């Protein structure tokens, strides 16, 4: 006679960060030409919902509304395009 023992496995789902967050960066995006240089890079990112640059701010602030985007990732995108970018705390 075969005896089978059933085991119930209880799993807890891994936490998924679905919260929308706003990231703010100091940049050297000082004019519309420079902003145009990075526009397509930010527009095609699947987790960046919205972004803008405040040219009237002394830090030329880049503001990104996103889901699951690390600040370092944004900094690298701009650095690879030849621009300065540092997260503001």
For the regions a protein language model found, what residue spans apply to each?
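Conserved short beta-strand edge segments in small beta-sheet-based binding/regulatory domains
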Residues: 16, 52-53, 82-89
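Short beta-strand-to-loop capping motifs
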Residues: 27-29, 63-68
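C-terminal structural segments of small proteins and small subunits
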Residues: 67-88
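Short glycine-/aliphatic-rich beta-strand segments at the starts of folded cytosolic domains
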Residues: 12-29
């Amino acid at each position: 006679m075969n005896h089978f023992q059933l085991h119930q496995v209880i799993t807890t789902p891994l936490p998924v960060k679905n919260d929308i967050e706003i990231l703010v960066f100091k940049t050297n995006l000082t004019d519309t030409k420079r902003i145009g240089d990075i526009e397509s890079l930010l527009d095609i990112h699947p987790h960046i919902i919205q972004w803008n640059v405040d040219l009237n701010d002394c830090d030329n602030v880049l503001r990104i509304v996103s889901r699951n985007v690390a600040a370092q990732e944004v900094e690298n995108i701009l650095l690879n395009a030849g621009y300065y970018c540092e997260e503001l705390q």
